[in-house]
Amino acid sequence: MNNDNIGREPIDVVYDKRFSSRIKPKTKKKKRNENRMRLVRIQHYIYNIFTSFLCLFIVILILYASIDISINYGPVIILYILILELGSMLISYILLQFPFFYRKLKNTFMRARNINKYSHQYRPLYYDNNSFTDENESFNISDDEKKEKRKRKHTYSFMSSDGGRKRSNFRRFLSSYKSKKGNEFVNSKTMKNKTKKNTRRKGFLSFNWIGYKNGETNKNRNDNIVNDVYKKYNDDNKYNDDNKYNDDNYNDDDNKYNDDDILNSHSEQDQRKKKKKKKEKRIVVFPRNDTGGNSFKRESIYIDDCNMWMKKTMRKSNRPNFKLTRSLSFNINMNKDDDLMMKDSASLDNIQIFLGHRSSKFLREKNKLQKRKTSIYNKYVPLTFASSYKDDFFKEILKSQTDGIISSSSDYSSSSEDSNKNVYKTIYINNNNNNVDKKGKIDEEDNIVVRNNIHSNENIIIKENPYSLRNAILFHKEKRKYRKNINTLSDDDNKNFAFHSGKKKIKRKEKKRRCFIKLKCFNKIKNLYRFFINYNMKSSKSSNNLYLFFRGFYIYTKHRFVHYLSYEPIWIVAILIRIVLWCIVWIWAASYMERKPKNFEITEWNMKNVPSFYGYIECTFQWCGVFDYFFGLYFSNNKLKYIFSFFSLIDFITTPVSSLIMNFFVQDNINHNYWFLILGPLRFLRLVRAESTISSCFFWLNDVKIIIIGIIILALAILFTFSGIMYILEAPDIERDFVKPLDFVYFGVITMSTVGYGDYTPVTKAGKFLTMFIIITCISFVAAQFKRLKEAMFSPKTVMGIIPKQDDDYILILGPVSPTQLLYICKGINNSFPNSVESIFLFTPLPVVIYRYVYGSIVKNTNIKICISGGNECFICPSIIYDAVINSRALYILNNVDSEKYTLMYQQIFLASNNINFNNHDHQNQRISSDDILHNNIINKYSKDKTKNWKYSDLFSEYKNEINKNNMLNLEMNININNSYSIKEKDDQECLLRFIGTYNICNSLIPITLQLSNNTYEELIKSMNVYNYISIEELKYALLAKSVNCKGLFFLIINFFYKPKAVKSLKKYIIDLKLLMYNGMLRRKNRERLSSSNLKIKQPSQQKSRKGNLINKISLFFKKGQNHQLDAEGISHDEKNNSNTSRTRGNNRNDHMDPQIKGKGVFEMNQKEQKQVMLKEGMNKNMNKNIIKDMEKNMNSNGKDNINDSINESIEKNDLFFLNSLDPNDDRNIHNLSYKNYYYMLEKVNLNMYYYLEGLKYNIYRFQFPECMRGFLFQTASEYLYQKYSAFLIGIITINKEIFLNPVNYIIGEENKYFYTSAFSGIILTTSLDSLIKLSSINNISKKVYEYNKRLIEEKYKSTFSKSWINSDDDHHNSDHKNFVTNTQIKETQIDGDEVKIVLTSHDDSLHPSDRSVKNRKNSMKSIYNQKKSNLGDQKKKNRNQDDRTEHQVDDNNDSDYLQIESVPKKKRNMYYSLVLGICELENYISAYKDAFVDKDKPLLLVCGWPDNIHMFFKYLKRNVYNSSYRNKNNSNIHTYDNNNNNNNNNNIYSKTVKNKKGKRKKMKKLNDDIKYNIIILSLHVPKFNYENDLFNYSENVVFIRGSPLNSYNLIQAGVFYAKRIIILNSNHSLFIDKDAYRIDNEVIIIKNIVNQLFNYISKNKENYFNLLRKTFPKEYIDITINERIFLNDNINNSPNINEMIKGKMSDSSYDSLDDNYSSDDDSSSSNYDDDDEDNDNDEDNVDNNNDHGGESLLLKKKRKKKNMIKLKKRALNVNNIFNINKNPYLICLIKNSESLEYIDGSINLSYENYNDNEKMNKIWENCGEYIYTFELVSANIFVHEMLHNLVSFSLPISKYAIEYSVIYSLIGIDINEYSKNAQKFHKNLNLSTGYVNLVPIPSYFYKKSFYKCFSYFLHNKLSLCIGILRYIDISSLSNKSKKIFVLSCPSRTMKIEPHDQAYVIAHRM
């Protein structure tokens, strides 16, 4: 099958002659209309031809005149033109940035004062160390620094303000120095002078540390890093017998370089190192005598060194010798034998190796080789922010393995060697040639290789990919050299080579081609050539590549450079500056003009005295004026109108054409400069446009100021024009002394002011007429201008900006759009679709004043022309906006998404209460309860005292009657705190009314987009066929509902619609975040040093004793935290079942608490308990002994540096260490674990923030498939685009907005076979619009990709051919395109060694369907399967009969919903109900699980707040696709043998399988519609009833508890400790009278902190938890039924539940290994349905066997319905499960305004009230949407409502590359497509199916491997597209209690997978 010819065959259209007779003849009216249309077209053509010829004529004329005047001056004019252009732009830049320059100057002059003011913040922290003798009072210097010389530029460590040139800080800190030998005193000045000669200044960031001279300082560590990576640390050489240092000499023989093993770049360094080092004097510090007689050494650590480091690195990031450890002020040459430094050395070494610095570790084997592996993809790994230089050897080695470093050593290796031979290369680094043979071989026995053992807690079967090795070769870019040897080629290549070798011409061409290929620039030029060919925005009919190249280059430069420059304020102001300078030049040159007195002819002026340099200046200005004229003509939409406009005619007159015309009429050969001076006064008229220029560029000026400046400039322009013309006409007048131009300026002022002194009167007629004209003009001018000024000062402004004209390309927006949404829309267009929108016209009823700063920031930072008209509701009436609607490109009708912000803020909501007193004296002591609110009393008629016993017969009717009564009372009283729904509803109605008014005008002309808050009128809008419709509230709650199970989903999707531009601020934010975390740890460390007095510098003899002490400390460390655990063999079966199945991690510090409690419920230990405790202690002792033995072995083998490594291994093997060793009261234990890997954790956070930044660059676009991809399988195309271009192809979209995500079986271009109207487009995630255009312009793809694609398609056809002949013959014509993967069975095998195997098996009988053996085999398999089903059915009938005895009889007419309602009250007849909007109001969490919830095993979802639209949240939570755990598990097992049917019974069997599948689908739908959570709503207020927020359908899963989440007591009552998910909604949580949007956001933030503090409080001490239980659950604590099982049971053996409640077992839900689709909760819930599923299978068989008896089938159906409900009700309350504490629940906060985020993260600057106007405009633009990169939002815990504001910018009318925002619904699993029957058939023919985003675990095999391997695994094995990673990172500096979530979208190919990572994949629906 040739895929290249698909869709290219011509379509033959056949006409039938029978229909020709039916065609009516044309009437006269139709002929007239046709003739008119032809005339209009002809006129249009004539008009276009005329304008084009006129423009061409003007351009040629101006160019001819300009070249004519510049011939005499030569090419120097070009230099002058450049100087003038650049100079004017520089002046304009200074003027535009004047406020910023003023601010910088002010800061520089005020900085000296602030230093003294804040000097206390820069004081160092000191700690004192006891010294042994006076001789040893020196800093210990390591051997690394001893054997290296480094020449430093200046000192940086002590923050000297002069940049290190003056040692002022040294003078304060140290007074003198002492030498080692002669006890010489050396001052800092003398030391500096001595070393100044030997030092060379380099651009390095380095330090001069105390303790040695500059001459003895180290060299660049990067230069010597190859030679000194691992050195032996010799304790014997370090100290003398007299405790003195010896200077080690450098051994040249032992440290030679081998040229074969070391990089050539270090050859120059080798020659330097071969020179002998000279011994120099060592500087020793004098000790300071303490009062106690002991001498102390004081060391300082500056906390604020980090901030200075940040500023320096931000300025100069390419300095190659930057040291992280020195910049962090931590490596201050302290003794490495110190205890504290020893514990931190492991983590420091990881950072040093990670950044390419020298490691401080030393191995005992001096000359061992080290193996390191690098990846071939290291070119894709960018620099991190921590590494600030490029040329670093170790960084190049560790680029791709950044996350693979462990604390044991810097070595690492892959878990598989065979599969990575082609991927990795080995680099050997050594110091000498001892281990290298003559042949270059290496002894592998001596090599040290540390392997990372992967401990997988999952039994995941991984399959081998047969295409994995081919893909790496297929897409890898290799520059292959041409080989002359023919023997190395294949047979086919040999034939081709021999065939071409005989032709000389072909050989020459090949040689030329090889020469071009060798050139580096050739490929780039070739790619650019292709890029410009395919860049044409409009499809061109021409096929000439040269024409297309120039046309594409023209369009690219126009849209990317020229168009952008034309709207830049710098360019516009520069034009104005050149006009002013040009006018000044004329005044200067005109003063040299002479003419005889009383000779008023124009041609009699004498120009001899004019300077000759004036010609150069005038020619330069003339050329600049010509360029300005051409620029305006080029970008004008109506060129004819532009040519004949007033300003254009003035510009045309001032060009050189005027001198050419004057010379043509005046035949005297006069110089061109003559006419330039004569016509020079007209150039002043070009200043008339200054007002519009100032208003568009100088945003900080007020409107009144702009008008005043405009009036002044206009008056000056008229004045100088009139004075100049009068000077040319009347001068000189010697009698009245009017000779110079300035004299006539005086006359002009008198004339324009109509004063008329009479000292001069014009003589000529032209002068008199001109004077009269000016007088009349000025009278009208002054009156009009002053009237305009008065209106601007006293009248409200209704228009802001320039109203677009009829011919302009603009987008019209109607409605009260909030300023923030307008800003988001414009910024989204500018960042994602630059230059796609020319102008925006906004009609709004809101006051225009509120858009002032937003308008200025948009115009200043974008090329978008914006006009805002509004101020009154009548401004957007249909009659007024008719013309604007007709001429627009698209229409957007938007509502006010921030309506509460502008309306509720100014409204007072009154509360009717008897107890509320608003006196000023009593408001502090007054409390308002919920019963005091009149509205709550109305809604909840039945209070606690007056409870009513509800019966089922009266339940439904009385419920509705009470609702109706309460609703009427609400309407009458109109009192409700949460009345935002009415405000939004009113705003939606007004918006809908505007839509109806404009729908009749432009429905068929332009697309309409409608945005509403609620979805009340959704059906009406869909019936009107609106182009785009979005409900903000519905989309918000849909995203929240889908994110409940799929963590971080809303944040992942929103990232696709954002692209932050403030990259510099983001880098600064990441560095600030890192340094804040570092400062917190450093302060803690300094406190410990100040408090500890045992810090001593220990001798080498004392090092041996430290080993034993450390072992004893570790053994004590293990003993401390061990709590009482039951023996594994003695654990009862009930305890195993009731224990929490979620995995516990190292951050659970208090997982097991002691059972002894003081106070009530004290437990006494029985004899059995004591025996168990003794058994556990003995077990723990044995475990500790084994651990200590392992550690001693590691210490003996690897040295003392591996002690921490052995601790790590023991931690991984023994869970007791993590679970029980951390005593919260023991600070030493926390110190040991927190400081161990702290520095490595800092770099890990930094690196992941960088990965997140890279993912933010991706946006979602519409992708037009190139022609070369026709015939590609979607799977091949997605893999190819990601492998080669790092783009994610995730789906396709049709012209009808039908979206299909991950259609694995779709073949690109196959829709043309079925004559589809337009080709499908792709949905792609890529970095920019340019990269998207580059992808759509791909022309050539390698042949291997085509072969790979063909092989994939053939294998899919083979696998599906077996199913095509089983099915009926009716669908035979579609067998080639149907069900590619349905019959493909993937057999998973376990990992054999390090290999991953994937076996694709299909039926062997597919090739021979007529074989009888095959049929017999099928029949035997089918019979076996039926026998198994029948046996299972017999067993289940018995169980069913037993269950039927307990069932009650139900009428046949009752449906399933009625049964669900009836089953509740029959079991709970004595239950008291108080219904609120359809759900029960209960007291606390225990009563909810005891009495209300139907399914007790479901996890808890706590919802804080009750907004008006919460029913939308429950609706989408019920429709959650992620609840389909049953479908995921059983979809592949449904009738696997149904396809193996006998051909004789094919029809009957096929009908049965269809029925069985339909039944399964119905059951799966019912299971999916169920909410998988028990929900508790905690709120103080209840919204008003509006017939939509009725929650009666969710009463089985939802319960209401009245209380405020601001009160911790109410939170505990609602079960905050036991909730798996917590959602804090944006609603009123307090009883304030006013409802401010900002105040509600602040309440959400307060609740978030209260929840976190509650968990911290109970984690500190177990007594705190029990005290809270006694207070919050007093009744349940006394209750016998609960207390006997939990509180008062003394027998531990008989009460397994005590482990859950009393010991406070806390399950960590921060990361679930299988998260929610595979979580234990879903497994438990799905396991409960197993019996029901089997029953249904058996019932379905019975139904099929008894088709003739319809009555029996009906009874079976009814029994099935009853069983499902009865089995749920039979489940008893499992107190064990409901008291499981989720220590780290997933919490989501909903915030309305982004300004409130400042209280969460202080680095976010979102408040602009303290800035002036210009700074406010800049800050608004810079910070708009940039909060999305903050550390809090990365964890997907905060949902900001403003994130949805920019979705309007991603729609097709904006750009043809824009995707519809309806793709969000497809991503979250909601199919909004409505297909007809024909469309469904068409989709089946193309094998189209859509997917959704799901969160799945990543197999442990891929840990520490690149993301690309994981991507290919999911693509080939799971048929899923991986688009993101959910990562957990420990960010706690001093404890291991929690982990932070990182949502990384669109990861890079080389990013390493870490443990516990989960993947966001777009799953494929079968």
UniProtKB/Swiss-Prot annotation:
Renumbered to this chain, the Basic residues biased-composition regions fall at 272-281
In which residue ranges is the amino acid composition biased (Low complexity)?
1138-1147, 1532-1548
Task: Provide ranges: composition bias, Polar residues.
Answer: 1421-1433
Record-linked SUPFAM superfamilies: Voltage-gated potassium channels
**Chain spans, region Disordered:** 143-164, 236-283, 1127-1158, 1405-1459, 1532-1551, 1709-1754
Q: List, as start-end ranges, the regions of compositional bias called Basic and acidic residues.
A: 236-259, 1127-1137, 1148-1157, 1405-1414, 1434-1451
Q: What is this protein called?
A: Potassium channel K1
